[in-house]
Amino acid sequence: MGLKNRFIDLCNKHFSLLVLGGGSASFFLINIILKDYLHAENYGLYSIFITYISLLSSFGLLGFEQVIIRNAKITSNKIILSKSLLIPIIFSSLFVSILGSYLFINNYNISISIIFLISITFLVILTKLIFNLFRLMSKFTFSQIALNFWKLSLFFVLLILVLRKNVVNLEDVITTIFWSLVITMFMVFGLLKKVKFRSNLKAKRIFSQAILFLLSLITISLINFGDRFFIESRFGLEELGYYFFFINLFLFPFVLFQSYIGFKEIVSFKLSYNHNLLVQKLKSILKYSILFGIFLLSFSFFVDYLEFYSIDLFENLEMILMLIVLGVVKMVYSLLSSAMGAICDNKMLFKINLYSIISILILIPVIYYYSSTITITIMFLIVLWFIRCVIWYKQLLLYEN
């Protein structure tokens, strides 16, 4: 009985990780299912749509959600927020929803109305806000449910469609995402009595912080998602779908661990930070990331060789190797980002954003003129992430000194 209780207690403590893992596994399988059941161009359109909602989830509140995280006070299990944040949050979410939807509809031939897309975009932004509010309250399970419910729902709906009709179309996918986000909104009722507003922040401070965070979010979003928009514009929707499929197989597993590291290590660095600890963790994460990359490549070889699933490993080996290298670099970045998130002030944030923007502006013309293949584009992406890692590391060294 004691063992059973310990097991239940362990599950309760780490259930948020189970939800995170379930959502990530569902998303992984969703992309594989849709690759097999959607037409190549529709899969490319699905890829750009997922990129769009991921992008809007990142900076849909124009940096104000980071102001909430930085300045919120937790007392008696309640979140105390500044009243001055209300209008900026409402305005930014509506503005981004309308502008983002307008740009998407005008650039991509997707068979949904602009009103429907505005609604989805607005729900995506609110979902990320709900996630952050639950996270502030240390309700990690609820935060992960809010963030991952649409992935879990979509996976089960796709299973039903495949088993019953053996037919899946893009409209079914988008409609399922919409209704899953609508259901997620009911989690707001769990926050109504937990969030209180007080006048404790000046508007000038709120907007100055939001601008700094927005710059940071734009730079990270640009190198996180910009490659997909570039590949679509340079090589077309079908090639984007092809690329999206391979990043799902060979980069997404790294991103899953990257999210976990960011989730865990920022708390560790807030409790105690020093350079020796950082170097020790960097060596460890580099070693295990390389080993994981070797495992991923070996596992894929056996899957392809034994014909469990057709990956065309050798035909795409150069691109796959570049994606694994990118995954290793992003793992290192996730640790540096956690350390920076734990100790940085506005001055440090401004510097790293400035250096990052300069490096991106220098490389953009080079990427534009020399990216003749998807593999070369990934190589430039690795360079961008490596430069970002160097910038972060140098700033952390200055902090220590």
Segment roles from a protein language model:
Residues I87-L215, V325, V329-G341, F350-Y355:
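Hydrophobic transmembrane helix module of multi-pass membrane transport proteins
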Residues E171-M185, F246-L249, I324-V325, I358, ...:
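Small-residue-rich transmembrane alpha-helices that serve as helix-helix interface/gating elements
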Residues K13-S24, I79, L117-T121, F134-I160, ...:
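Alpha-helical transmembrane segments of multi-pass membrane transporters/permeases
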